[in-house]
């Protein structure tokens, strides 16, 4: 442990900065123009975690008053050894960007963890840079998500990539003589490999120190999912009921009733498409249960349409911004409800009783990018000590949902889908099923899976609808990474009143589902242990390994390249994208050099077996899109 007041000779190594109204202080003690601000810092190596340091910083004003507007922690520069440095930048915007990004010359990204667009905010308070020989991560060890930025930049004509933890104070803070400014608790971690190691170490520290408690998933959370979303919002009850036998026949266990049953966001009773009201919803769950299926209900809490009965009768539930306006949710054309508000809590409890008891659903599919974060809440009815308690404590709202739902149904599966967002880390501890959350590509399914496996190894991860993967059929991405499989096929026809699709279960799609369902159930990789044996960005092809049933399951992937100007391969005509392929050598890491193994191409239509020597674990391959391999001791 080291406690010191930094002197002038340390200025070149300075990693903190104070942005003040009077000066930009970048070396300490700062003694210019009559100021005297001293930095004190404790740097504590964490026992038994090589490379991890906990950093606690505070500033003492020993001179004339100074007004602090912002501060930086852990400012770090990495010398680029190649033309690209890979990074974890888990912040959220409406661009729905990859969490993992290549950083090249000219790159700059702010990574603010508060609200960046009307619906988008939140993330993970960790930023990581790595190269072939290892990486360095910085972040916060705080009890809630602080609204910091994590800027990453590679300035043109240089060879340094910088990152920092930047905090803009909500209001300028005047430090009088003798006052102290205590900063957020930060960390720095040097590591081998990629972002998996950074997130695993961060999350393990958070759990070991009682800051968060991750919830292990029960067997039900790993069962395959069919979602009625393929029928769209104007779906009818008979469409769902008419599909159940086929759902059962194909091996799915969960039936997710999607958006469209409700009067409006906020008024969650059934609309005119369900004239029987509560009886119709109960009939759906009864028909599911009769077939041995489970039913999960889609729900977008904390959203209320302006013309709803809820808004008219309970304005005290609405979040108010610093301008005393309602916070708007663009996607739903709704307003935010206050997440930390006693009236909202009571309203939510009543809804849970309707969903899980009266309607008898077995779980919840909680959905919407707005669930990841919100603006500060100035609603006096919320009773907050600070308006910033709303975004910081927002995940606790979902913790209450989880606890109440599990009290009503002890094996309820609670999924939160922050669509397109980098998940709010503090949400992860309030659920028992994570989700790929509207992935833009197969690659996003895989990179998110790796992140969740690092943060919460026992948490089920649903790979979302297969229709959202490249080509709409990439079961290899879901199964090879240990994800729960799912689909939103329609049967026997699409909904003529819904323009999206087609999602119709064709003979070809049915054959594909039957093949991969058998593989999914026989190997049970979703319940296996994810091993971090390959480095994202530097090992090619992209590789993942799952340990399950005394076997190692390898999965290798090459991604399509979209035509110039296309947003993403998953959202262009497959005919215009060349099928990606790889021909060359693969190294099977993690094998014992003293043993001989049998390798099985377990997803091939005609599985091939061959021998692998652990002392020389390389094989020659030639494949398109993916190559999945099961390796067992001989």
Indicate residue ranges for each PLM-predicted region:
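Catalytic domains of carbohydrate-active enzymes, especially glycoside hydrolases
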Residues: 239-261, 358-360
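Active-site-proximal substrate-binding groove within the catalytic cores of carbohydrate-active enzymes
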Residues: 179, 183, 398-607, 618, ...
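The substrate-binding groove and active-site-proximal loops of carbohydrate-active enzymes
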Residues: 222-238, 264-278, 330-349, 381-395
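C-terminal beta-strand-rich structural cap/linker in extracellular carbohydrate-active enzymes
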Residues: 610-634
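Active-site-adjacent "subsite" loops/lids of carbohydrate-active enzymes
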Residues: 216, 221-225, 232-234, 297-358, ...
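Glycine-rich, aromatic-flanked loop segments that form ligand/cofactor-binding clefts
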Residues: 193-212, 227, 254-256, 277-330, ...
């Amino acid at each position: 442990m080291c406690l010191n007041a930094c002197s002038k000779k340390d200025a070149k190594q300075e990693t903190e900065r104070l942005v003040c109204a009077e000066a930009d202080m970048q070396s300490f003690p700062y003694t210019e123009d009559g100021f005297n601000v001293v930095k004190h810092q404790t740097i504590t190596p964490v026992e038994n975690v090589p490379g991890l340091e906990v950093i606690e910083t505070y500033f003492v004003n020993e001179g004339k008053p100074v007004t602090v507007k912002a501060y930086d922690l852990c400012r770090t520069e990495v010398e680029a050894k190649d033309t690209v440095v890979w990074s974890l930048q888990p912040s959220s915007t409406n661009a729905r960007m990859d969490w993992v990004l290549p950083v090249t010359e000219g790159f700059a990204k702010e990574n603010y963890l508060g609200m960046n667009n009307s619906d988008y905010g939140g993330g993970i308070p960790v930023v990581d840079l790595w190269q072939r020989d290892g990486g360095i991560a910085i972040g916060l060890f705080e009890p809630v998500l602080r609204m910091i930025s994590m800027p990453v930049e590679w300035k043109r004509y240089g060879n340094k990539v910088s990152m920092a933890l930047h905090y803009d104070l909500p209001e300028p803070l005047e430090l009088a003589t003798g006052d102290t400014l205590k900063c957020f608790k930060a960390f720095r971690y040097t590591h081998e490999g990629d972002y998996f190691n950074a997130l695993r170490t961060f999350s393990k520290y958070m759990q070991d120190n009682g800051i968060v408690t991750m919830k292990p998933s029960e067997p039900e959370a790993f069962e395959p999912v069919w979602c009625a979303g393929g029928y769209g919002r104007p779906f009818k009850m008979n469409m769902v009921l008419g599909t159940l036998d086929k759902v059962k026949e194909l091996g799915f266990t969960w039936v997710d009733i999607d958006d469209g049953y409700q009067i409006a966001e906020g008024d969650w009773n059934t609309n005119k498409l369900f004239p029987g009201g509560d009886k119709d919803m109960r009939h759906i769950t009864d028909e599911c249960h009769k077939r041995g299926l489970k039913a999960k209900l889609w729900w977008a809490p904390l959203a209320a349409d302006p013309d709803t009965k809820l808004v008219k009768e309970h304005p005290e539930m609405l979040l108010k911004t610093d301008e005393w306006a309602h916070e708007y949710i663009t996607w739903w054309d709704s307003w935010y409800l206050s997440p930390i508000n006693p009236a909202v809590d009571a309203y939510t409890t009543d809804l849970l009783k309707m969903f899980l008891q009266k309607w008898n659903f077995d779980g919840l599919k909680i959905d919407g990018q707005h669930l990841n974060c919100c603006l500060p809440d100035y609603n006096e009815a919320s009773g907050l000590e600070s308006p910033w308690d709303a975004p910081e404590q927002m995940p606790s709202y979902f913790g209450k949902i989880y606890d109440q739902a599990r009290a009503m149904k002890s094996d309820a599966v609670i999924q939160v889908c922050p669509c397109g967002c980098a998940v709010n880390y503090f949400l992860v501890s309030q659920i028992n099923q994570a989700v790929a959350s509207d992935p833009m590509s197969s690659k996003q399914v895989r990179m998110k899976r790796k992140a969740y496996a690092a943060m919460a190894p026992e948490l089920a991860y649903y790979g979302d609808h297969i229709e959202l993967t490249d080509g709409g059929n990439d079961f290899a991405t879901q199964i090879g990474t240990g994800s729960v499989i799912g689909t939103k096929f329609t049967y026997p026809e699409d909904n003529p009143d819904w323009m999206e699709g087609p999602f119709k279960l064709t003979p070809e799609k049915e054959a594909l589902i039957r093949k991969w369902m058998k593989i999914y159930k026989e190997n049970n990789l979703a319940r296996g242990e994810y091993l971090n044996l390959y480095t994202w960005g530097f090992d090619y092809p992209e590789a993942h390994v799952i340990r399950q049933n005394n076997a190692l399951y390898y999965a290798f992937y090459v991604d399509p390249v979209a035509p110039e100007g296309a947003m993403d391969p998953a959202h262009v005509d497959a005919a215009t994208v060349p099928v990606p392929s790889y021909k060359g050598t693969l190294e099977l890491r993690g094998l014992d050099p003293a043993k001989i193994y049998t390798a099985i191409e377990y997803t091939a239509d005609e599985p091939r077996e061959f021998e692998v020597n652990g002392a020389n674990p390389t094989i020659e391959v030639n494949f398109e899109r993916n190559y999945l391999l099961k390796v067992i001791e001989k």
